[in-house]
Amino acid sequence: MSARRTSREIAVMALYQLELTQPPLKEVLKFKWYDKKTEPEERDFAVSIVNGVVKNQEQIDTLIKKYSKNWDFSRISIVNKAILRLSIYALLYTWEVPKNVTIDEAVELTKEFESEESARFVNGVLDAILKNEIKSDG
C-alpha cells in the first residue's frame, strides 16, 4: 500500500474520531490511537489532510449537503462524511493528484470502510462536485 493511501486511511479515522467524540484536534493528531507503524511522511500527510478539512469544513459540508440529493446530511454515516470531506478537500485545495484519481481513491476507501452501495453514493456526490464546482484540469 502506498504511503499516500495509508495517510488517507489514517485521516479518515482521525476525521471519524473528531466527528464522533469531538476530542481536541491536537490530541487526535498525535495518533496515539493508531496502532500500526507509520512513517513520518505518512503522519505528516495525514495531519495536513485533517488540518485542511477542519479549516475548510463549513464550505466542504455545504457542498456535501448540496450534492447529496435525497439524503439528509444527518443520515450520512460518519465514515462516509469523513471520506467525502477529505476527498472534497483534495479536489478543491490540492493539485498534486489528478481529480479522477482522488475520486477513485475515495471509492476504494469507501469500499474498504463501508460498502459498495456507499461507494456509489460517494462517487456520485464527488462526480457532481467535480462537474459543477471545479474548473477542469485542462
Swiss-Prot record:
The keyword Transcription is assigned to this record: yes
Gene3D superfamilies listed in its UniProt record: NusB-like
SUPFAM superfamilies: NusB-like (SSF48013)
InterPro entries per record: NusB-like_sf, NusB_fam, NusB_RsmB_TIM44
Any GO MF annotation of the entry: RNA binding
Keywords: RNA-binding, Transcription, Transcription antitermination, Transcription regulation
Gene Ontology cellular component annotations, sorted alphabetically: cytosol
Keyword check for Cytoplasm: no
Protein origin, superkingdom: Bacteria
Gene Ontology biological process terms in this record: DNA-templated transcription termination; transcription antitermination
Pfam families: NusB (PF01029)
Family membership: Belongs to the NusB family.
Matching NCBIfam families: nusB
The protein's role, per its UniProt record: Involved in transcription antitermination. Required for transcription of ribosomal RNA (rRNA) genes. Binds specifically to the boxA antiterminator sequence of the ribosomal RNA (rrn) operons.
PANTHER family the UniProt entry points to: ANTITERMINATION NUSB DOMAIN-CONTAINING PROTEIN, N UTILIZATION SUBSTANCE PROTEIN B-RELATED
Identification of the protein by name: Transcription antitermination protein NusB
